[in-house]
Amino acid sequence: MSNSVKGEIVKIAGPVVEAVGCEGAKMYEVFRVGDEGLIGEVINIESDRATIQVYEETTGLQPGEPVKGTGELLSVELGPGLLTQIFDGIQRPLPEIRKEVGDFVERGILVSALDRKKKWEFTPKVKEGEKVEEGDVLGTVPETEFIEHKIMVPPGVSGEVIEIAADGEYTVEDTIAVIEDEEGEEHEVTMMQEWPVRKPRPYKRKLDPEEPLITGQRVIDTFFPVAKGGTAAIPGPFGSGKTVTQQQLAKWADAQVVVYIGCGERGNEMTEVLEDFPELEDPRTGRPLMERTILVANTSNMPVAAREACIYTGITMAEYYRDMGYDVALMADSTSRWAEALREISGRLEEMPGEEGYPAYLASRLAEFYERAGRVVCLGSDDRVGSVTVVGAVSPPGGDFSEPVTQNTLRIVKVFWALDSKLADRRHFPAINWLQSYSLYLDDVEKWWHEEIGGDWRELRDEAMEILQRESELEEIVQLVGPDALPESERLILEVARMIREDFLQQNAFHEVDTYCPPEKQYEMLKTILHFKERAEEAVDKGVPVDEILKLDVIDDIARMKVIPNEEAKEKIQEIRKKIDEQFEELIEEAS
C-alpha cells in the first residue's frame, strides 16, 4: 500500500472533509481519514488541497487529524463468493463485519469483500502454450449449484499461457495462471480481479435488445415489456408498491443473476428480502433464490455519502457477471435517494444548485449509470453474449412526476411503469397505470413473442389497450348519466374492460400461483377475454341484451383463470374458450 500522500484535515462539513498537504493525490483515490482511518474518496483537487467524500459517519473528527492516501481508486473485488453475499455501499460484507464487531458497524473497519481463506474447486479450460486474449475463460468454479463462475483473463492482458493450475482447490489469492505478453512480461492471474467502480467494464460491442426479460407479471410482460439489456423506471408515490414490484422482479425475472441495491430505503425492506429469498424457490432451477442474488444494502440509517457509491458498486458487480455471458438484472431501490445524496454532497461543496437544489450534473450522472445497462458481445474469443438490465425505482415527493429526478430518468430509460396511488387505494396491484405507462421495446420483442408464444400476440395486446382507453373515455359519461343510458355495445366495452383490469392486470404477489404467470398462460388468458368480447359483440348484434350476457357463469371461470396452476393452464383455459362458444350459442338460439 503506497502511503506517499499524507495531509491533515482543515475543514469538516458533514460527510465532506477538506485536507491540505495532499500533493500527488489522484481524483477518486481512496483515503483513510482521521485517527480512526475512515474510508473516503477524493472528489476535488485544488493545488495541495483535496476534498474528500467520507463514506462513514464523521462525528468526532477534528481539524488537524491526519489523512493518508492509499494510492488506489475506489474499487470492488470481483471473484467467486459474491453470490448470496450482502454488502454495504462500499462492498464490505455485513455478515463478516457482524462476526468481528457485533451488530453495529464500527467506523474505520476494513474487511475484505471476498473470503481469503475459503477454497474453491477450480477446473482449467486452457492448456499451457495456448494463446489467450482479454476476457478468455481460463477455468471455471462452481460458485453455486447452477452458476458456474468463469475465471477470465483480466482486461488489458493477453498473450501465451505459460502456467495453468491443475484441477484442485484454491483460494481467491492463489495464482491459477501465468500469461506472458508480447513484450515478454509475465502476468500472474488469480481468481480475483479488482475494478474501479466508476469505470464501466469493457466489451466488444453492444447488441440490439431483442429478447424480453420475462418477469411473470402480466401488466409488464404483455403490456409494457422490458428487453434483456434494457432500462426501466418505476416512479410512484409512497405506498403505491414500488418495493414490492422491485422484489417481484428480483424474484421472478428470468435473469441468471440478480443484483438488488437498497439505496437509502428502509432497513426492514432489505430484511424482508433477506428473509424471503432463501425460502423462495427459483421456478427455473428449483433452488433458493438467494443463490443467484447479490445484495447491496445501504439503508436510510447508513451514512449518506456511501449511497452515492453503492449504485456504482452494484453495477460493477453486475457487469462482471455479464462478462461471463450471463443475463443480469439490477434493481436499484431507490435512485431518488441516490440523487438526494448527490444533492447533499453538492451543497457541502458549495456548488451552484440547479433545479430544486439538485446539482446541475444530475442528468449526466443518471445517464452514466443507466448507460452501463445493455446487451453486449463480451470480451474473449468465444463471443459470449451477456446483458445487464437496469430497473430503477424513483420516489418523487408527493408522487409529483414533474420533479427533476423523474424527468431526467424518463429522458434516459425506455420503459416507464407509472405507479398510481389511486389504483393502490382501490387495492389494484400492481398499481401500474396503463394509460400513463409506456414501453419503447414493443417492436424489438414482438418477434420473440410471435415465434415463441403466439403469432397474434401484438394484435391482442393492442386491442386490449384500445379497450382500456375507450373505457377511460366512457367513464366521464357514466359518471354523469350512469351506465344504463349507454348503448348496449358500449356497456359491453365497459364489461370487457373490467375483465381486463380485474382478471388480467390485477395480480396477487402473495398468492402461490398468481405471483408468477408464465408468458404462455398470459397469452391464453388475454386471448380468452378477447374471444369472450368477440362472441358477446356477435350476440349483441343479434339482439341479446347485455344483462343476459352478464348472467353467464363462464364469466366466473374467466375470473378464476389466474389461479389455475401454471402446468394445467393451457388445457383448462382452452376448455373455458369452448365453454364460451357453447354458452353464447345457447343464448343466441334463445334470443332468436
Curated annotation (Swiss-Prot):
<dbReference type="InterPro" id="IPR022878">
    <property type="entry name" value="V-ATPase_asu"/>
</dbReference>
<dbReference type="InterPro" id="IPR024034">
    <property type="entry name" value="ATPase_F1/V1_b/a_C"/>
</dbReference>
<dbReference type="GO" id="GO:0042777">
    <property type="term" value="P:proton motive force-driven plasma membrane ATP synthesis"/>
</dbReference>
<comment type="subunit">
    <text>Has multiple subunits with at least A(3), B(3), C, D, E, F, H, I and proteolipid K(x).</text>
</comment>
<dbReference type="GO" id="GO:0046961">
    <property type="term" value="F:proton-transporting ATPase activity, rotational mechanism"/>
</dbReference>
<dbReference type="Pfam" id="PF02874">
    <property type="entry name" value="ATP-synt_ab_N"/>
</dbReference>
<protein>
    <recommendedName>
        <fullName>A-type ATP synthase subunit A</fullName>
        <ecNumber>7.1.2.2</ecNumber>
    </recommendedName>
</protein>
<dbReference type="GO" id="GO:0046933">
    <property type="term" value="F:proton-transporting ATP synthase activity, rotational mechanism"/>
</dbReference>
<dbReference type="InterPro" id="IPR004100">
    <property type="entry name" value="ATPase_F1/V1/A1_a/bsu_N"/>
</dbReference>
<feature type="binding site">
    <location>
        <begin position="236"/>
        <end position="243"/>
    </location>
    <ligand>
        <name>ATP</name>
    </ligand>
</feature>
<keyword id="KW-0406">Ion transport</keyword>
<dbReference type="InterPro" id="IPR005726">
    <property type="entry name" value="ATP_synth_asu_arc"/>
</dbReference>
<keyword id="KW-0067">ATP-binding</keyword>
<dbReference type="InterPro" id="IPR023366">
    <property type="entry name" value="ATP_synth_asu-like_sf"/>
</dbReference>
<dbReference type="Pfam" id="PF00006">
    <property type="entry name" value="ATP-synt_ab"/>
</dbReference>
<keyword id="KW-0375">Hydrogen ion transport</keyword>
<keyword id="KW-0547">Nucleotide-binding</keyword>
<comment type="function">
    <text>Component of the A-type ATP synthase that produces ATP from ADP in the presence of a proton gradient across the membrane. The A chain is the catalytic subunit.</text>
</comment>
<dbReference type="GO" id="GO:0005886">
    <property type="term" value="C:plasma membrane"/>
</dbReference>
<dbReference type="InterPro" id="IPR027417">
    <property type="entry name" value="P-loop_NTPase"/>
</dbReference>
<dbReference type="InterPro" id="IPR003593">
    <property type="entry name" value="AAA+_ATPase"/>
</dbReference>
<dbReference type="InterPro" id="IPR031686">
    <property type="entry name" value="ATP-synth_a_Xtn"/>
</dbReference>
<keyword id="KW-0813">Transport</keyword>
<dbReference type="GO" id="GO:0016887">
    <property type="term" value="F:ATP hydrolysis activity"/>
</dbReference>
<dbReference type="InterPro" id="IPR005725">
    <property type="entry name" value="ATPase_V1-cplx_asu"/>
</dbReference>
<dbReference type="InterPro" id="IPR020003">
    <property type="entry name" value="ATPase_a/bsu_AS"/>
</dbReference>
<keyword id="KW-1003">Cell membrane</keyword>
<dbReference type="Pfam" id="PF16886">
    <property type="entry name" value="ATP-synt_ab_Xtn"/>
</dbReference>
<dbReference type="GO" id="GO:0033180">
    <property type="term" value="C:proton-transporting V-type ATPase, V1 domain"/>
</dbReference>
<dbReference type="InterPro" id="IPR000194">
    <property type="entry name" value="ATPase_F1/V1/A1_a/bsu_nucl-bd"/>
</dbReference>
<dbReference type="Pfam" id="PF22919">
    <property type="entry name" value="ATP-synt_VA_C"/>
</dbReference>
<dbReference type="InterPro" id="IPR036121">
    <property type="entry name" value="ATPase_F1/V1/A1_a/bsu_N_sf"/>
</dbReference>
<comment type="similarity">
    <text>Belongs to the ATPase alpha/beta chains family.</text>
</comment>
<keyword id="KW-0472">Membrane</keyword>
<dbReference type="InterPro" id="IPR055190">
    <property type="entry name" value="ATP-synt_VA_C"/>
</dbReference>
<keyword id="KW-0066">ATP synthesis</keyword>
<dbReference type="GO" id="GO:0005524">
    <property type="term" value="F:ATP binding"/>
</dbReference>
<keyword id="KW-1278">Translocase</keyword>
